[in-house]
Regions:
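Carbohydrate-interacting/catalytic domains
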Residues: 1-35, 40, 57, 69, ...
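Conserved alpha/beta catalytic core and glycan-binding cleft of carbohydrate-active enzymes
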Residues: 13, 222, 229-394, 407-409, ...
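Hydrophobic faces of well-ordered beta-strands that scaffold small-molecule active sites
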Residues: 33-35, 77-79, 138-140, 213-215, ...
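Short, solvent-exposed loop/turn segments at secondary-structure junctions
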Residues: 39-44, 83-85, 145, 219-220, ...
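Substrate-binding/active-site clefts of carbohydrate-active enzymes
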Residues: 40-210, 217-241
């Protein structure tokens, strides 16, 4: 491709963004409740925000957004990538866009598509400050493991045009090493790669003012040995600013699984926990026997079999995340439905550990509906009452559905509902429902009560087995969910 991309993606833009004083909430890990959300999806349907501001950084800092987060009881929001990103050419050709944003073209630039003004930096800073003023921390999902340039046939819009050989990992003259499943692997372990990532992290920390980072496909950032030997992670540990940030690893990539290998003060997404909880509630109970009790017990007590002396707050517990079924879909669907992405349903995981309670998708059967509602509450209770750091996915508290999609990373280029051709043409449920029906309001009430219980009696930094004590029975202190 010999077209000039300079007017779309200049190789450099020099700015003078000075570090600023930021009042971080500094919430202890054992008190943290993380809410994973998308800037646009969280605010797009909020009726209290002017239409022209919905889906933007300004909407993120709107008082109604903040009031909602405070009402449900979460105190940290983990934002899907907000750095400048691009849609893959093949996806764009199908009339769709990359909604999630895991396709970076500029590590230290806020995505312009989420700005309501011509000054996205100031707009984002104001949103972060407003969240901080209300006791809510901001964690960014950052993608330094690959870029939007893809493999050998991909576009030349950033690092390929500067120094392709040194900015990407190569296995031969032109062969890209792909540890990410996205066509390339960024050389984050080389000195120039380390410097760039550190500078980017410091920019987000000191200029924007965020409180922490979740590192996408973290093992891909280090291919030289174990996590202790990583040049990048060593540089983060030595940096006086970054070592104070909250650091969360997604401890796997497509060729390496590293759960439990990261060292303090890192925390890790715990998919062992996810699978154990799903297997117990949606696998064993569905079959009428409980082989997964042992795995469930170790998981809810802090996963000491994985994190050992590091303690339970090393585990970020989750049952759902942006990729995979929503909690509602876990009890509605057995089969994935990713046809909207245009890949003939080949994409997405085929192993979901879900249970549709005998009917695939929506039903009017009151008995099935009651079981599904109870299962969602059981999943919520397990997550929020476990030792570790809980993370809930946006909308699970109000029964958000993606209609069986477990890879809802694309949306139509045109978000006008009048132009959507049925459920099969889009990954539904990409926005938060700000006006839930009676059943979903019931879920939200249960969610809020569970967080209240957690924050008043179950916050702990040690494994359950070392802190367990018996309390006198008092029915007035018992919360019961059906």
């Amino acid at each position: 491709d010999d077209r000039n991309s300079a007017k779309f993606v200049p190789l450099s833009v020099v700015t003078n963004d000075a570090p600023r004083h930021v009042k971080h909430p500094r919430i202890n890990w054992q008190d943290l409740v993380i809410y994973e959300a998308h800037v646009k999806g969280l605010t797009w349907a909020n009726p209290e925000i002017p239409e022209e501001e919905r889906g933007t950084y300004k909407a993120l800092g709107h008082q109604s957004t903040i009031d909602y987060l405070k009402k449900i009881g979460v105190n940290a929001i983990e934002l899907l990538p907000i750095h400048e990103h691009a849609t893959e050419p093949a996806i764009w050709a199908r009339g769709r866009r990359n909604h999630w944003g895991y396709n970076a073209i500029a590590f230290s630039t806020p995505h312009r598509g989420y700005a309501s003004t011509s000054d996205p930096i100031s707009e984002l800073q104001e949103a972060v400050d407003r969240l901080h003023e209300n006791g809510i921390e901001v964690i960014l999902d950052v993608v330094y493991n690959h870029t939007a340039e893809g493999g050998p046939g991909g576009p030349h819009i950033t690092f390929k045009g500067i120094d392709n050989r040194n900015w990407y990992r190569h296995g031969g003259t032109s062969h890209y090493i792909d540890n990410t499943g996205c066509g390339n692997t960024f050389s984050a372990g080389k000195p120039h790669g380390v410097r760039l990532v550190i500078d980017s992290l410091r920019w987000w920390s000191q200029v924007i003012g965020v409180d922490g980072f979740r590192f996408d496909l973290a093992p891909a950032l280090n291919r030289t040995g174990n996590m202790i030997d990583s040049a990048l992670f060593a540089a983060i540990a030595a940096d006086p600013v970054l070592r104070q940030m909250k650091l969360i690893a997604e401890p796997w990539d497509i060729s390496r699984y590293s759960l439990g290998e990261f060292q303090y003060p890192w925390r890790e997404w715990n998919d062992y926990y996810r699978d154990a909880v799903r297997q117990f509630w949606l696998g064993d109970i569905a079959r009428g026997y409980g082989e997964g009790v042992s795995a469930l017990a170790s998981s809810i007590s802090g996963s000491s079999n994985i994190f050992y002396f590091r303690g339970p707050t090393s585990s970020v517990n989750f049952i759902t995340a942006h990729d995979g079924f929503t909690m509602n879909d876990l009890v509605n669907y057995h089969q994935k439905n990713n046809l909207a992405n245009g890949e003939d349903n080949r994409d997405g995981n085929n192993t979901n550990r879900s249970w549709n309670v005998g009917v695939e998708g929506p039903t009017d059967d009151p008995k099935i509906l009651q079981i599904r509602q109870s299962l969602q509450k059981s999943l919520m209770a397990t997550l929020l009452l476990s030792s570790g750091v809980p993370m809930i996915t946006m909308g699970d508290e109000v029964g958000r559905t993606q209609f069986g999609s477990n890879n809802a990373f694309t949306l139509p280029i045109d978000l006008n509902k009048e132009n959507w051709n049925g459920v099969s043409a889009w990954n539904g449920g990409w926005t938060l429902d700000w006006e839930p029906n009676e059943a979903n309001q019931d879920l939200q009430n249960a969610f809020m009560e569970l967080i209240r219980i957690r924050q008043t009696t179950l916050s702990r930094s040690q494994y359950l087995a070392t802190t367990c004590r018996f309390l006198s029975s008092s029915l007035s202190r018992i919360s019961r969910f059906q």
